[in-house]
A protein has these predicted regions:
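Short beta->alpha connector loops at strand-helix junctions that form conserved
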Residues: 30, 71-72, 88-99, 176
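Phosphate-binding beta-alpha-beta segment of Rossmann-like dinucleotide-binding domains, i.e.
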Residues: 86-88, 94-148
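A short, aliphatic-rich alpha-helical micro-motif
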Residues: 40-41, 59-62, 144
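Rossmann-fold NAD(P)-binding glycine/threonine-rich loop
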Residues: 76-88
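N-terminal glycine-/charge-rich "phosphate-binding" loop or analogous flexible N-terminal tail
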Residues: 1-44
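Rossmann-like dinucleotide/phosphate-binding beta-alpha-beta segment
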Residues: 135-187
Length: 187
């Protein structure tokens, strides 16, 4: 089996890919410009990508290809009509980043809601130490409890963010981008 990694740069430097050697011959490219994809995948049975487009232009000569494995959750870079019509399966790593993205959402929200950039600068500038008052409320901030939290898309990440928002006392509303999700827990 021929396994081709087209962009190991997207995996980071701390990932050991040696186990793939047990499955067949493995070729690893740190990065692949789109114009080099057809040549690099022409003999592949499995192609592992992150963001590189997989479509008729890049896959036309890949007559042995059986699987495109995406090292991400999104697969919008794969022309599914083309791969399906050629018997090429697609797989992703759904769910690998759900907690990280939900957590990052709240990190950014707290950064903005609590004016952390302003107060970080205020303390580091020394102004806090020279202030005659103990408290400084130049920039107002508030709590989440009782606020309305809107979510666009109620997939795995949206549901996780909604759950955390409810734990903070928020009223959660959402818009389903696909029209498929009619989650009764939220408006």
């Amino acid at each position: 089996m021929e396994i081709v990694f087209l962009e190991t740069i997207s995996l980071g430097d701390d990932i050991n890919l040696d186990r793939f050697d047990e499955l067949g011959h493995v070729t690893k490219y740190r990065d692949t410009p789109v114009e080099l994809v057809p040549e690099r995948v022409k003999d592949a049975d499995v192609v592992v990508i992150n963001k590189i487009p997989m479509n008729e232009k890049t896959l036309a000569g890949a007559s042995h290809l059986k699987l495109v494995a995406v090292t991400a959750t999104g697969m919008d870079n794969i022309d599914r009509a083309y791969t399906d019509s050629h018997g090429i399966l697609s797989a992703n790593v759904a769910g690998y980043s759900t907690e990280a993205v939900a957590q990052h959402t709240f990190a950014l929200m707290f950064y903005v809601l609590h004016k952390l950039a302003y107060y970080d600068h205020y303390v580091k500038s020394g102004a806090y130490c020279t202030s005659a008052q103990f408290s400084h409320f130049e920039q107002k901030f508030s709590e989440l409890d009782g606020k309305t939290w809107g979510i666009v898309g109620m997939g795995a990440i949206g549901k996780r963010v909604a759950s955390h928002a409810q734990e903070f006392g928020c009223n959660v509303i959402y818009y389903s981008t696909s029209g498929k999700n009619t989650d009764q827990l939220y408006e």
